[in-house]
Structure formats: structure tokens, C-alpha cells
């Protein structure tokens, strides 16, 4: 799964259908003549869901016009796109596999609470096996270990409490706004 022909040889672990970096990280290219300076490169996080809110802002449409019967999980990233030294406004991104919350990334740290088992029989996206990682979450520093091979450990790690709190806050949004069955 982490090698050719499924995932290729990349600096990241996993492939499409997993929540490891190789399955979720994709390059993004933004072009807007006269607004976004060409040649700028950034390593900041820009989630796909941010496109909606960012597009609203850039089009001058107020978020107040949106229906209030749903939760909007986006962060306005317009300043990140149009300023030369713009920094990403997203501190964390959550990883889901269907209806299963799998983990979180906050800056350079990533915590897995569940993983997709690549050795599972019938390892296709529809038949993958999800497994809890154990008593303690797997915590990786992606700047040091982009392949997510060596957990940094969970004892006395200052990031673990922050990541756990973020996961709980994110999960709480589903109480007020439960997922809707849209028939897919």
C-alpha cells in the first residue's frame, strides 16, 4: 500500500483511502492575476472545506446570508491567498473515514486515534478495516517524521492535551448539528 503501484515512493505514509499524510495531503495551486502573486510557496494547511468560506469572502458575500440550520466547517483563508506573507488561518484539520473520526493535525503534530489497517483482506476503499490504535493515541511530529513511522510518545507531551481538547470540541459540534443521511 505504501509502495508502487498503489502509493508510489513518496516522503509520506499511506495512499488514497487512508488518513495518513500520503492519503490526505495534496498540492494546491491558486491563480488569480493581479491578486495572488505568482511563485509563492507555502507549507501551511488549507483544507478543502475552506474553499467555500474563502470564496464567499473574496466575492464580498456575508456569511450572515447563509442558512443557520447547519454547521459550516470552514475558515476564511482569503488573507492567506492574497497577501505575500499571508499565513494560513487554519490551526487544525480533522481526519474522517466515512463516519469515523480518525485523528487530527495541529500545526506540525498529528494524532491518530484510529487507523486503516493496510494488511486487511480486501483492502479496497469500501472494504478497509478500521482499528483503534490502542490505549494511547499515536502522536507524530510531521516536520521530523513525515512518513509517520515513529510516534514521539504520549507521556509529558504538551501537544497531546491540546489535540485531545480540539477533538472533543469538534465532536461536540455533532450534538447540535447531527449528520444528515443524504442517501449516498
For the regions a language model picked out, list residue spans one by one.
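C-terminal cap/loop subdomain of S1 sulfatases and analogous C-terminal strand-loop tails that border
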Residues: 1-21, 36-138, 142
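Long, internal low-complexity/basic segments
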Residues: 51, 112-115, 119-121, 128-138, ...
